[in-house]
């Protein structure tokens, strides 16, 4: 995404594989998410489960026996939590959800946030980003809730992340027996508690399944790069909406 693979190859003297999204987009897909086939390779098995990545945006990979993996974004993960925390505390993130824990979830505000965003109601495959879920979006939706304390809003935003994930999983793979969590949000103890409460099934970090949560994305793209080098198709049309699987990425030799 930095779009400097030729420069990287020149400076490092190492073959570089990059630009994984373009071929999927050319085939009619959304170009994201791209990690579900790696999740399937690592965590697929004889029981239905989900893998939840909590970066700025939350995305789910659905793994069911004898089925192609499916995946899609569910809404904001850390993007709103971090921005609201930065504005009101000066800290870049809410460590372990401690600030959120000092507030109270407002049920009416939570429902207003969910019901007021059409994207949340749209069916998969779908993806989103900071172009939609940002402080402009949040400020517009808080305009009628000026009486809420910043800590109460933080608590409600944390539950908003958990509830939108739970709603998406219940609609797409209700038989999932567990949820494995990766990304920065897996280190937020408060968010993990909210997820366990909303999902009503075991929730654990991918560390417990053998893959460090903070390295998941890096490992996934290393895997995608190797798939390209081997000439293997890694795109999953059930995930991105493309017309078919494609070999993803472009090689920039050293």
Where are these predicted regions, by residue range?
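Short beta-strand-loop/turn "lid" adjacent to the catalytic site in phosphate-handling enzymes
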Residues: 1-2
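Generic structural signal for well-ordered alpha-helical scaffold segments
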Residues: 39-44, 143, 159-170, 226
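Conserved ATP-utilizing enzyme core subdomain
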Residues: 70-162, 166, 244-254
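Acidic-glycine-rich active-site phosphate/pyrophosphate-binding loop
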Residues: 10-14, 56, 132-140, 190-201
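Catalytic phosphate/nucleotide-handling subdomain of diverse soluble enzymes
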Residues: 83, 163-246
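Alpha-helical scaffold segments in soluble metabolic enzymes
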Residues: 7, 11, 37-41, 83-87, ...
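A short glycine/serine-rich beta->alpha loop
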Residues: 22-29, 69-71, 148-152, 205-213
């Amino acid at each position: 995404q930095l779009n400097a693979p030729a420069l990287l190859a020149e400076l490092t003297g190492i073959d570089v594989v990059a630009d994984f999204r373009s071929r999927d987009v050319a085939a009619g897909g959304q170009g994201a998410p791209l990690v579900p086939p790696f999740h399937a390779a690592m965590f697929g098995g004889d029981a239905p489960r989900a893998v939840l990545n909590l970066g700025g945006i939350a995305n789910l990979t659905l793994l069911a026996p004898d089925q192609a993996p499916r995946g899609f974004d569910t809404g904001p993960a850390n993007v709103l939590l971090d921005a609201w925390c930065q504005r009101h505390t000066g800290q870049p993130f809410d460590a372990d959800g401690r600030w959120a824990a000092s507030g109270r979830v407002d049920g009416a505000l939570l429902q207003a946030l969910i019901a007021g965003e059409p994207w949340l109601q749209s069916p998969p495959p779908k993806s989103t980003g900071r172009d939609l879920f940002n402080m402009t979006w949040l400020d517009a939706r808080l305009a009628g809730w000026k009486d809420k304390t910043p800590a109460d809003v933080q608590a409600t935003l944390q539950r908003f992340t958990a509830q939108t994930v739970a709603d998406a999983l219940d609609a797409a793979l209700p038989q999932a027996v567990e949820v494995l969590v990766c990304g920065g949000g897996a280190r937020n103890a408060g968010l993990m508690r909210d997820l366990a409460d909303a999902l009503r099934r075991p929730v654990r970090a991918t560390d417990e399944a053998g893959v460090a949560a903070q390295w998941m994305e890096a490992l996934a793209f290393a895997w995608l790069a190797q798939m390209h080098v081997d000439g293997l198709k890694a795109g999953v049309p059930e995930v991105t909406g493309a017309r078919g699987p494609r070999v993803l990425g472009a090689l920039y030799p050293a």
